[in-house]
Amino acid sequence: MFDKKVYCQRRALLTERLRSGVLLLPGLAPSPVNFAANPYPFRQDSSFLYYCGLNQPNFTLLIDIDSGRETLYGPEDSLEDVIWTGPRPSLNELATRVGIAFADSPERMKMAVQEALAADRTVHYLPSYRPDQLLTLSRLLAVSPERVNEGASQDLIKTVVFQRSVKTAGEVAEVESALGLCRKLFQTLLKHLRQENNAVALAGILEGIAKASGCRFAFPPIITSRGEILHNQPDNVPFKP
């Protein structure tokens, strides 16, 4: 995470350019592998991370652009949650970390969105790429899932692109750090290429290095001797000399 001033400045510029209405920015929920308690490794929505910095699931940011009120909505940990995860910061503590003044429950978020819609206010939101989030937005906005993305805010899309296209010194430092890790990964790949001689083993080595560095791949690694096949998944067939 960056300093909370960074997130405050990003949100301030966002609301300044949108001028009026309500901004709805949902984070992501866990995605189960084969049952609810066995989720895939969590990856937060990038736009939510950009404006909130919180890499935990089930949070939503709502900003009343006209009044400037920012509220982080999300669940408090139950006893069952604490048994699995240990004590974690409260919702209010998380909001404070990123400079958000108010925090409330998901139920109150639904009421706030419904009140905005009833008052015929513009609700700005981004297009959704996750089916579960499409359904959530469908229920919130009272439109069919097929029409949710049709109502996405073009002004919000343009503003997010405008902001995220310009990198601060802190962001550039993070990009350079990632490039340094990429260099290490390619050097390791060349070092082990003849010794391992199959894509699965090489992918495992590289994924281990990424995880040990506190990172993970944005998409599955493409390691193949058949460059004519796009997005070929690693297999254990030996490379031909």
Predicted segments — roles?
Residues 171-214, 219:
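Active-site pocket-lining segments that scaffold enzyme catalytic pockets across diverse folds
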Residues 4, 165, 192-196, 232-235:
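Hydrophobic alpha-helical scaffolding
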Residues 98-99, 200-208, 232-236:
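Alpha-helix boundary/capping detector
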Residues 216-229:
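Short, basic/aromatic beta-hairpin or loop at an interaction surface
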Residues 161, 187-191, 228:
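A broad detector of the eukaryotic-type serine/threonine protein kinase catalytic domain
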Residues 1-184:
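A composition/biophysics-driven feature that prefers long, compositionally simple stretches
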Residues 51-55, 64-66, 228-241:
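Acidic/histidine-enriched ion/cofactor-binding microenvironments in catalytic or ligand-binding pockets
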Residues 117, 166, 194-195, 217, ...:
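Hydrophobic beta-strand core residues of beta-sandwich domains
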